[in-house]
Amino acid sequence: MRLSEVEAYGGPGQDPASHTYRGRTPRNSVMFGPPGHLYVYFTYGMHYCANLVCMPAGTGSAVLLRAGEVIAGVHTARVRRMPHADGPDLEGLVRRIPDRDLARGPARLTVALGVVREHNGSDCCSGGPIQVHEGRPVPSGQVRTGPRTGVSAGAETPWRFWIDGDPTVSPYRAHVPRRRGRAAS
């Protein structure tokens, strides 16, 4: 996979949108480990998201893998995106997913890669099951920055990075505050 979009998250006390904002917990402890390790978490009761630890051990910051282009294993990624499809219609259903949508968004990306909770803490730089390799450079003029998607605290921080014009980049969605129900009178 060639990454096309990421979001950065700072360490304790720095970034209110980060899982480490209030310090180390059993859930976020991987983010305090060495760089190059995968921090995987379950969100909204239905999706996994994957972050790559990016600062020295003890720092507690990572980069959310938001979107990418599947460049190898396209058929496998398609099948993973259709986990409940089977039978004679499987191939037809699998082909309906446009290439650009296979890993467009953090949950789709983890499904396309086959990332699950058991990958939490995996070393992506030294031969683990999920590996990161340097790809072809993107000209700096094609890299854009802006506010992170869907976060409320720290929403104004321009730590979302994407390749301009890349069709695999997920659409920007500003955080929409939840409407609280009115108290009964």
Model region roles, listed by residue range:
Residues M1-S185:
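Conserved, well-structured core segments that form or line functional sites
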